[in-house]
Amino acid sequence: MEIKLEQLGYCYQKNSPFEKRALLDVNVSFDSGSYSAIIGHTGSGKSTLLQHLNALLMPTEGKITVGEREIVAGVKQKKLRDLRKKVGIVFQFPEAQLFEETVEKDICFGPMNFGVSEEDAKLRAKKVIYEVGLTEEILSRSPFELSGGQMRRVAIAGVLAMDPEVLVLDEPTAGLDPHGREEIMEMFYNLHKEKGLTTVLVTHSMEDAARYAEKIVLMKAGTVLQIGSPREIFAKPDALVDLGLSVPDVVRFQGLFERKFNVKLTKTCLTIAELITEMAPYLAKGGA
């Protein structure tokens, strides 16, 4: 499912003394089945943009098109439930939203709230619990008896049980250890490929943006500063650092190598394998 934002703008508490501009003239599209990342410093508008993707927030200017559904600023919208079924959002610390007495009931809550029968919802719960790396026996347990990592997977299963066509991820690995982060990100990537999901990741991790995204949207102060491939975005690491962002370790090491040997490699490397290949001629000569 394609998503397109055209001249999108948003103000909190518009036309009040407390009006605050959050987004201005945002133009970006997310192709059906693509994996995109949105990056930017805290306060750049990433999460505000994200909440427009399933109409949790409505634009104050411009429009957003999600599949066949068009949302135009100032036009009253009906039947937003249909849109919200198709666009699933995993927020930071989603386990904080768990509340039912069993894992199964928690996973079933969303689908049943959107009109899915209890029988069908239970079948979905059995399916998605495996998709998030857990087993069926956990369905009868209280979510509050589980580890933090298991609780997060259960919360994610609740989003997947809605059978979305678009998956929006807002810092989905916040608070996890490195191993847990990698497991969760690999899980999302596998789901993206297997289900053909349109995936949009909001992240502070440049490593994840470089590793998984096909396209990166760089934001600053509510505007889109640049749109490009990971290689294009990370080709100017100093500009990202000036914005208060980090760069992937491979990119940082490439910069150190180029300065040390006074050379310029033929491309911005995103993996260790690429970097080794690029450095090999200079290392063989003992430097340039």
Swiss-Prot record:
Q: Where in or outside the cell is it found? A: Cell membrane
> What membrane topology is given?
Peripheral membrane protein
Kindly list any coiled-coil regions of this protein.
Answer: none
Cite the CDD domains for this sequence. ABC_cobalt_CbiO_domain1
Question: Recorded GO terms, molecular function?
Answer: ATP binding; ATP hydrolysis activity; ATPase-coupled transmembrane transporter activity
Subunit structure, interactors included: Forms a stable energy-coupling factor (ECF) transporter complex composed of 2 membrane-embedded substrate-binding proteins (S component), 2 ATP-binding proteins (A component) and 2 transmembrane proteins (T component).
Primary role:
ATP-binding (A) component of a common energy-coupling factor (ECF) ABC-transporter complex. Unlike classic ABC transporters this ECF transporter provides the energy necessary to transport a number of different substrates.
**PANTHER family annotated for this entry?**
ENERGY-COUPLING FACTOR TRANSPORTER ATP-BINDING PROTEIN ECFA2, HEAVY METAL TRANSPORTER
What is the official name of this protein in its record? Answer: Energy-coupling factor transporter ATP-binding protein EcfA2
Protein source organism? Listeria welshimeri serovar 6b (strain ATCC 35897 / DSM 20650 / CCUG 15529 / CIP 8149 / NCTC 11857 / SLCC 5334 / V8)
Q: What is the lineage of its organism?
A: Bacteria, Bacillati, Bacillota, Bacilli, Bacillales
